[in-house]
Amino acid sequence: MAPTQNTICSKHVAVIGAGAAGLVTARELRREGHTVVVFDREKQVGGLWNYSSKADSDPLSLDTTRTIVHTSIYESLRTNLPRECMGFTDFPFVPRIHDISRDSRRYPSHREVLAYLQDFAREFKIEEMVRFETEVVCVEPVNGKWSVRSKNSVGFAAHEIFDAVVVCSGHFTEPNVAHIPGIKSWPGKQIHSHNYRVPGPFNNEVVVVIGNYASGADISRDIAKVAKEVHIASRASESDTYQKLPVPQNNLWVHSEIDFAHQDGSILFKNGKVVYADTIVHCTGYKYYFPFLETNGYININENRVEPLYKHVFLPALAPSLSFIGLPGMAIQFVMFEIQSKWVAAVLSGRVILPSQDKMMEDIIEWYATLDVLGIPKRHTHKLGKISCEYLNWIAEECHCSPVENWRIQEVERGFQRMVSHPEIYRDEWDDDDLMEEAYKDFARKKLISSHPSYFLES
């Protein structure tokens, strides 16, 4: 959509969340001339990257009265993307080699990601826009604007009116738990990966881990360091799958899905194998959940599809005053947050115009029909995967910003291939030094780093 020639408007905008999405959204909104208030329940920026050894009071996170811990980070977590392709486009996530307290590895720990986000917030003076320890309890449309009710840690309640609201609250708090026939009578323990922190509690146990992607692959191998046996139940595997993996302790097996959980403590897999397990760990993802949002029925979550959303961002009936940043998965997350937020900021200012409500709905209906034809279930609507860069470049063209760099796209593709083929070593052994070199040369050309690329590549 071509930029408009109308006078640029400045809006009063509420941003919900001060994680990676909220931070870059606040920056882009302010760059576009908007006034911004960011709400976050934590004491510092970083969102889910704020590690806590604490977990929900309910290990499965099903009890609605549970004490909730708003992070899903486990102690051993390292990024599953190379740092140079993970960072924001104009603030590279490069090693702070001169600082011995920092993690200079190419696939660093969660603590290094938090430090990077704190660096970003300081560099762009974002913290001055954030109300820390403040929870948004209700957001609803009122006379063309938005009512935002919040309360802080000492119980002070506030009610304010904003021109627009951008939801950057993430989707890693409300766990999705696998349906297992017979599980109600199964006597063992269950926990969702949201509440997993360290392997110690599983010492000498037989553990079944449901899920073998990202956190499932990591957590199963982490637990295997101390457990007697670890058995992975993978929905992606064929029904007869049964494979013993030699790493890390020769006590790890991959199976097909669970068929039944029995009262005697046994777990029957669809491959016919039976295991007597102490604990089941659900690495089964999360549900989209916006308990504070009241839109009078305009928005619905249907089988984990947030609908109807135009390009995963705008709700046609309330666009552009309500938008979402960061809903899609299987994408270059921080870059996606940045490009989506540039679009939202430009649309709110009037510099870029959205299609009409009818046109946006037509696009959404056509997209849903395409997913149906391809046999993609509703729950995967927001998983981009192979189309992620096409999606991001489409938005970039809309708001006249740079597309995703080729080296970044290739790094993600090759990194994913390594992760699938060598999950134990892909973070420490790689074959794309050429792309890493291209990335640092790109940073140098754009004057985003002060040192010569060789300083980072040879360290």
Curated annotation (Swiss-Prot):
Q: Where does NADP(+) bind?
A: 211-216
Quick check: keyword Oxidoreductase in the entry? yes
What Gene3D superfamilies does this protein's entry cite? FAD/NAD(P)-binding domain
> Does the record bear NADP in its keywords?
yes
Keyword annotations for this protein, in alphabetical order, are: FAD, Flavoprotein, Monooxygenase, NADP, Oxidoreductase
Tissue-level expression: Mainly expressed in leaves. Low levels in flowers and seeds.
Q: Which Pfam families match?
A: FMO-like
Q: Which reaction does it catalyse?
A: a (Z)-omega-(methylsulfanyl)-N-sulfo-alkylhydroximate S-glucoside + NADPH + O2 + H(+) = a (Z)-omega-(methylsulfinyl)-alkyl-glucosinolate + NADP(+) + H2O
**Which EC class, in a word?**
oxidoreductase
Q: List the InterPro entries.
A: FAD/NAD-bd_sf, Flavin_mOase, Flavin_mOase-like, FMO-like
Q: Tell me the superkingdom of the source.
A: Eukaryota
Give the residues the record marks as binding FAD: 17-22
Name of the protein: Flavin-containing monooxygenase FMO GS-OX1
